[in-house]
């Protein structure tokens, strides 16, 4: 779960990370009151879970409370990369002398943790990593040890901090590691981490991603979820325990097993190049259970996406045999009735495949087309989606 900046700021503060004052506001009037309470120069910052706020006009400096009112009036309701701004954070202005970068994240490729640090912050870190990779220090973190004082010292030295700053920055890094470890995060990022004119090290912006698999250890994490900010289809799928991610294409995807679903996305995208450049509309893994209830729930979510023009069901029968999957599809279509109004291409293989195909053939549903292979199914689904565009 990604946190809003103001939530990350509050979490940092709770773990002793130095931050400046910040108050969330949902209306221009609340923004003005917050600016008056903080006093002096403030920054009005759009609260959306996406980057590029500054370039989109979602971050503005306010020298007075009236300016904070004006800026928040313009920012609230703004669309930033498809995300509507429903709240802003009024942040205390900072006297910035230098900007740095720090993050610690789960390194899935190497089954490890990774700390990244640079004395050049404030810019897109991806751009820095490409243009000047030597400016971004990367230090592997042993999960069994974490970031202790020795490792924090190693990180700041590798990043090239001046000797007189290393102790201060290392102290902040230790506290950020405390956030990462104790909150079960998969990402903690500060960009920029700044040195103020007074020489203090302060986290001026923050990004935190929490591991939802660890929610059972953190009752308070449920309170951080903003259902209004979630994609409605993803929220609907989550309520039904479906592993669903919405994408931007036209071909709905249902499969069993994350690996098979990801392969299906690739094959559909490739097939779409020959059919109007249609693309996958979602990732949906129904796992090992393909009952009528699960299939109906999955189809209900996918068919609720107005962008979807066809659906490709790609299942390899294992523990759940293909005949059970076929019965689930037939039952799902019957349960959904008129709301099932888009063509389905179904490819079955594996355990009891012949019986599964027989069940679908006998059902003879007008929306269902059987495919013998994944390539054939992807091509047909892309063709149908393109025809319906």
From Swiss-Prot:
Catalytic activities: succinate + ATP + CoA = succinyl-CoA + ADP + phosphate; GTP + succinate + CoA = succinyl-CoA + GDP + phosphate
Organism this protein belongs to: Arthrobacter sp. (strain FB24)
Record function comment: Succinyl-CoA synthetase functions in the citric acid cycle (TCA), coupling the hydrolysis of succinyl-CoA to the synthesis of either ATP or GTP and thus represents the only step of substrate-level phosphorylation in the TCA. The beta subunit provides nucleotide specificity of the enzyme and binds the substrate succinate, while the binding sites for coenzyme A and phosphate are found in the alpha subunit.
GO biological process: succinyl-CoA metabolic process; tricarboxylic acid cycle
EC numbers, comma separated: 6.2.1.5
The record's free-text note on cofactor binding: Binds 1 Mg(2+) ion per subunit.
The protein's annotated pathway: Carbohydrate metabolism; tricarboxylic acid cycle; succinate from succinyl-CoA (ligase route): step 1/1
Family: Belongs to the succinate/malate CoA ligase beta subunit family.
Amino-acid positions noted as binding substrate in the UniProt annotation, renumbered to this chain: 256, 318-320
Top EC class of this enzyme: ligase
Residues given in the record as ATP binding sites: 45, 52-54, 94, 99
Record keywords, A-Z: ATP-binding, Ligase, Magnesium, Metal-binding, Nucleotide-binding, Tricarboxylic acid cycle
GO MF: ATP binding; magnesium ion binding; succinate-CoA ligase (ADP-forming) activity; succinate-CoA ligase (GDP-forming) activity
UniProt: Mg(2+) binding residues: 191, 205
Record-annotated membrane-spanning stretches: none
GO cellular component: cytosol; succinate-CoA ligase complex
Cofactor(s) the record lists: Mg(2+)
A Pfam family the protein falls into: Ligase_CoA
NCBIfam families per UniProt: PRK00696.1 (NF001913), sucCoAbeta (TIGR01016)
Quaternary structure and partners: Heterotetramer of two alpha and two beta subunits.
InterPro entries: ATP-grasp (IPR011761), ATP-grasp_succ-CoA_synth-type (IPR013650), ATP_grasp_subdomain_1 (IPR013815), Succ-CoA_synthase_bsu_CS (IPR017866), SUCC_ACL_C (IPR005811), Succ_CoA_ligase-like_bsu (IPR005809), Succinyl-CoA_synth-like (IPR016102)
Name by which UniProt lists this protein: Succinate--CoA ligase [ADP-forming] subunit beta
Domain annotation ATP-grasp: ranges: 9-236
